[in-house]
Each structure stands twice: as structure tokens, then as C-alpha cells.
Amino acid sequence: MNTTKRILAIQSSVCHGYVGNRAATFPLQLLGWDVDAIPTVELSNHAGYPIVKGRTLSAEQILDLYKGVSAANPSGYECLLTGYARGIGSVKAIMEIVRSVKSKNKKAFWVFDPVLGDNGRLYVEESIIPLYREMLPFADLITPNGFEAEILSGMRINSIDTAFKCVECLQQKYKVPRVVISSFVVEENGVEKLYCIGSSIYSKSFFVLIPVIPGIFRGTGDLFTALMAAHIAESPDCTESLASIKEDKLKKSVEMALSSVHEVIQKTADRISALGVEEYHPAYAELCIVNSQNSIIAPSKLFEAVYYY
């Protein structure tokens, strides 16, 4: 009997590079998960390249693919990971799939990355925002970046204190049991600092101060969310309700995921330096995921989260 944990990942797909499901699938497999991946868009590469080819899948196509993988996997899924989707129809299709997965396995753990944009710029239609807010109460964990957390909560983040107020708003207003703001920058005493914070209704809130590695690296949020899903939904025999994990698993999962992502970024930055190229090309900054297998499985140095109160 196959006891390997199975996850359904629904987000963007690229032929070249490491964003969306391309950034998520291999790391999840390394950490012991069987991955069924459904694309919301199929692109040649990410949008940071000068030329991007591909297509957006319709809601009908997404649902059709789900019907196929669902029939092929009658035992269902222990975990569900959702990320970038383009258009209202695609978002509604994802919510329909979430309901279906959870109806077949009430213990299924949903990790929802509400991809809206970053650095003050939306990547999606504004009409998606209210739909995401409607979806929040059904998620077991959400992993917005700072910009996305601001949009969903309607609050401004300009300090670590306001970031935690933003998290509190999301938990109280939308009843989300676990919130991790994957990254946000605030100025402290004239110095910009990068933070990740997390909060669970089952344990204390915490934060991690992240050393900044200069550069433009795409797919880091997708990798982080995949690693969060792998670690927090980990269960030895999959009989325990994953949606009722009450110990400090969130804090430990963030420490592991952040440490792995940071090492992957550092390896990528080192590769760029070793190339010695004068003219930047986005291909040079594709995440070194394949060469970072040890960092994904067991990062050499763990970040230590600090309790907020």
C-alpha cells in the first residue's frame, strides 16, 4: 500500500525557470510528497523576461484537469496548495476544487498563497481581491507577502507592530487560523529591514529578521509556500487531522522554510557572481533549486524565530 503523502498544487507553470509549480514540485518531492500539479497558466518563462509566450487556462480547462487527476487518485489529498491564478473564472474554479478536495478528505490542509502582486504593483485584476477575501475563511494557512497582506486587510504596514496588527485583523475578520506574512520591508532608525512574521490561533506570534541578499530573484515566494506546506502538513501516518495541529509547528515550519529559501538564494547569488557577467539577464537569476537539494532537505543553518510577546 502506498503511504506517500499526496498534495495537489494549483498555480502557474513555466517551461523554463523556477516559479509557480516549477519552483514547488521538486522541493515537495524531495521532502516526501507525491505532487499532482494543475497549471492556471502555461508560459514559456516568467514575466521578468523580455519575451513571454504561452496561454491562460480557462476555468473549464482547470476543472477538467482536476476531474482527471481526481479520478486517477481516488484516495484524495492530504494537502492542497494554491497560488497564482489569472481571472475571476480561474479563481472560482480553484475554490470549487478546494471544496471538492475537502469534501473527500475533511483532514485536508489548504495552504493558500493569495498572489496579488508585490512592491506596490498588482499582478492580477482588482476584481479578484474580493474573491480572495471570501476564500480566506476556508484556508488553514495563508502566506501573503506584505503588499498582499495590506490589500487583504485594508491596513498599512510601516513597522513590525503594524504588521502584527494586520495579521490580527486577518485572523479576527476572516477567521484564518494561521497567517504568515512571508516578507515585508520596514525602516528602523534609517535602515531598511526585511522581516517574516507568523501567527497561529494555537500559539504565540513570532518574527524572523532576514539578512538581505542583493538581487532580483523570482519564485522565492512560491518556493517558500511550497516548503511551508511540506513542513506544516507533515504527519507520520496521515491519520491525525492536519487542520488541528496545535503545537508550535508553524514557528518551526517557518524557520525551516526560510532557512532553505535563504540558502537557495545565496547559491543563486554566488552563481551570478561566478559567471562574472556585465549585462544582466533574468536567466542568470533563476533559482538554483536542483543544486540546492541538501539545503531544501536540511538547511545547514536554521533561522531562529523570536516571539513577539
UniProtKB/Swiss-Prot annotation:
Reaction(s) catalysed (UniProt annotation): pyridoxal + ATP = pyridoxal 5'-phosphate + ADP + H(+)
Positions with a binding annotation for substrate: 12, 123, 222
One of the protein's GO biological processes: pyridoxal 5'-phosphate salvage
Location of this chain's protein in the cell: Cytoplasm; Nucleus
Top-rank taxon: Eukaryota
GO cellular component: cytosol; nucleus
EC numbers for this chain: 2.7.1.35
Cofactor: a divalent metal cation
Pfam families cross-referenced by the UniProt entry: Phos_pyr_kin
Gene3D superfamilies: 3.40.1190.20
CDD domains: pyridoxal_pyridoxamine_kinase
Keywords annotated in UniProt: ATP-binding, Cytoplasm, Kinase, Metal-binding, Nucleotide-binding, Nucleus, Transferase, Zinc
Presence of the UniProt keyword Transmembrane in the record: no
GO terms, molecular function: ATP binding; metal ion binding; pyridoxal kinase activity
Predominant localisation class: cytoplasm
NCBIfam families to which the protein is assigned, alphabetical: pyridox_kin (TIGR00687)
Known function: Required for synthesis of pyridoxal-5-phosphate from vitamin B6.
Family recorded in the similarity comment: Belongs to the pyridoxine kinase family.
Name of the protein: Putative pyridoxal kinase C6F6.11c
